[in-house]
Curated annotation (Swiss-Prot):
Protein name: Polyamine aminopropyltransferase 1
SUPFAM superfamilies in the cross-refs: MFS general substrate transporter, S-adenosyl-L-methionine-dependent methyltransferases
Spermidine synthase, as annotated region: 205-476
Subcellular location: Cell membrane
Family according to the record: Belongs to the spermidine/spermine synthase family.
Protein's organism: Streptomyces coelicolor (strain ATCC BAA-471 / A3(2) / M145)
Subunit composition and interactions: Homodimer or homotetramer.
Domain PABS: 233-471
Amino acid sequence: MSSALDDRAVAAPPNPPADHHTRGARFLLLLAVFLCAACGLVYELALTALGSYLIGNSVLQTSVVISVMVFAMGVGSLAAKPLRHRPVVAFAVVEGVLALVGGLSVLMLYAAFAWLQLYMPAMIVVSLVVGLLIGAEIPLLMTLLQRIRTQEASSAVADMFAVDYIGALVGGLCFPLFLLPTFGQLKGALVVGVVNAVAGVIVVVFIFRRQTGRLVKAGLLAGVALVLAALGTTYVLADDLEVTARQHMYADPIIHSETTQYQDIVVTRSTAFTGEPDVRLFLNGDLQFSSVDEYRYHESLVHPALSGPHSNVLIMGGGDGLALREVLRHEGVRHVTLVELDPAMTRLARTFEPLRKLNQGSLDDPRAKVVNADAFTWLREARQQYDAVIIDFPDPDSASLAKLYSVEFYDLLRRVLAPDGQVMVQSGSPFFAPKTYWSIAKTIETAGYATTEFQIDVPSFGNWGFVLARPGTEAPPLRLARDTPKLRYLDAAVLKAATVFPVDRRRTDVRPSTLMDPAVLEYVQDEWRDY
């Protein structure tokens, strides 16, 4: 008896309207399923990507968003059970609300981050609401599918989930390959919200128009029209809203900003206390340099590494062209390869006058070759050997960056490093993040290098550290090459003093970082949490 009751519970309504038993109606409903699935996955990806840009720690952001949304989807499915008696109206309302909340989700979270400093609580609430609404879609769509044509529950489930998964595939690919490059995060979410609203219109207007009373249908269509108007108005104002919110996060006027598929790029300009212009580059909110004192950082990063042979040089990272500028000052340099992940960064360094002026057009120097590729992947395929390697990656505050500070990465690097070559690695701050700094040094040593650690002061950064390394057991001397041009900051005395670490910042007991155990990611997230 229990089995019979269960079978009846999942069976389709016994008397589905005959006028809806058409292939066209079924196709349109499955199209709505496809659109809903694609939109749902895009919302999920948009939330995880935004969190990674604004907060970092992509693993945590992804885990929280997915966990909260999957939990909420289960709750939403249960909450939709009482609504199956009026599935057309319920589905239209769910789609309208989901279109509004999902479409505005990126803007709402960006505003919460910029003005309220409440990103994580807001992200959890938005993920919960979006998940509840997505979860309510499936049981309602299942009921509607059975009303079109009665079929076994297993067959209906198979059809529904097949289309659902295909829609998720398309949405997952569409987000990084089309929506982000074409519209950006904020406008992309708004466009997807419009698609979500269209899915509701398909059901109400084209499939079940005869089952919906005139007043109800008019009310639903009016609601959808309001949602579309809200999304459309926000789309028109999106650029101004984004600029206002973004400017609130930076002390100085923004002169350029763009969001690429890899990162958020912002350039600001103000007047320093000396009266000279202060141009600053930020990636995902983290300061990369100030034009007032960047020479201190880049002289320290480049010139000690070129104290040995330096005819053929490799730079990894440094898409702004400033490290390349310093390398090209050496007369002995014949060829430089710069590997930078984001083509938007190197394009900006070439064409945006404030950056081009700083890097002195280095990316267009005939001795320089720019390669836009993932450094880890490029290194696995590289065969040419280099006399010196300059590594200028951002701090390893995400899993994708932590792999570039791993034992495996430095193992690969040895394959392209000449036997007498040297490597310089920017390694963060020994003062603010000592465990991170010494973990990077230990990781390099674990990969078979001898190291020399040193630190400098960069006013816009504070204390900053580097690691000079070469294969073998003999630590490389910290010195300048004979053909070193006249420098503004470095000389022999400064380098000698730079190797002295105070007692409270000397080497500590830390783990090396590997792909399977990214210790440096753990350290950097812990030490930079309060800054």
